[in-house]
């Protein structure tokens, strides 16, 4: 298990509690199915990297306890965040867009 997630109780597919979102997203670099990667930092910044290019954005937990991101100049999106757990080990996160229902998974590298 990722050391930063020690003490977190998680089941596969369970919602990430609002209080655990910062710990969950900053626990390590996430790798997506298409090979893109993303890093979230504790100061609310994020960098998404794909095909040799980087995009800088921001992340936050909104007043409703949801994970949200902002990509300048104007794109905002909020997601339902769920744990990916295999053999009792937290291996990543599942994001589902609240606006469009699109789901994607990121695995800790």
Where are these regions (language model features)?
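Lipid interaction determinants
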Residues: 1-58, 62-109
């Amino acid at each position: 298990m990722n050391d930063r997630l020690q003490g977190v109780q998680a089941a596969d597919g369970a919602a990430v509690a609002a209080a655990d979102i910062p710990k969950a997203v900053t626990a390590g670099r996430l790798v997506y199915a298409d090979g893109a990667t993303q890093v979230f930092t504790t100061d609310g910044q994020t960098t998404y990297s794909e095909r040799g290019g980087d995009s800088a954005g921001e992340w936050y937990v909104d007043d409703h306890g949801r994970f949200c991101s902002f990509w300048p100049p104007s794109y905002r999106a909020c997601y339902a965040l769920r744990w990916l757990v295999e053999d009792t080990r937290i291996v990543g996160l599942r994001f589902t867009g609240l606006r469009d229902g699109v789901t994607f998974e990121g695995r800790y590298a």
